[in-house]
Regions:
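Active-site-adjacent betaalpha module
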Residues: 1-120
Length: 120
């Protein structure tokens, strides 16, 4: 199912989040190894400067059961000590059941799920 195609309305970031869109990542498919590399590089840069590394990464978006789960798991693999969070109230799956299944799978992989059930 094509979605979030560059230049389409679904690809645009809503005005309320524009200020956080400093470095959007265009990914060729649902999982972004580039995102993992960026997170690891940022973590290493912070540690070289004597600061704590990346401590928390929060994911929102669609589709919970495709893009969100893929990228949350990649982030956990690249930053195993960081807190990886998915805000379930800001996600949607292909179906409500696949959304819930993806949330359960992420929790089983030590990814925190916030606001689960708040929009069901």
């Amino acid at each position: 199912m094509p979605h979030c195609i560059r230049g389409s309305e679904g690809w645009e970031i809503i005005p309320q989040l524009q200020e956080y869109a400093a470095h959007p990542i265009d990914k060729p498919t649902f999982g972004s190894q580039y995102l993992g590399s960026l997170l690891r590089a940022r973590d290493e840069d912070l540690r070289r400067q004597g600061q704590p590394g990346v401590e928390k990464v929060t994911f929102i978006g669609v589709c919970t059961d495709i893009c969100v789960i893929s990228n949350a798991l990649l982030a956990k693999a690249f930053l195993p000590e960081a807190e990886i969070v998915v805000d379930a109230a800001c996600c949607a799956g292909v179906t409500p059941e696949s959304h819930r299944t993806a949330l359960r799978a992420m929790k089983a992989c030590q990814i925190a799920v916030e606001h689960e059930g708040e929009t069901d």
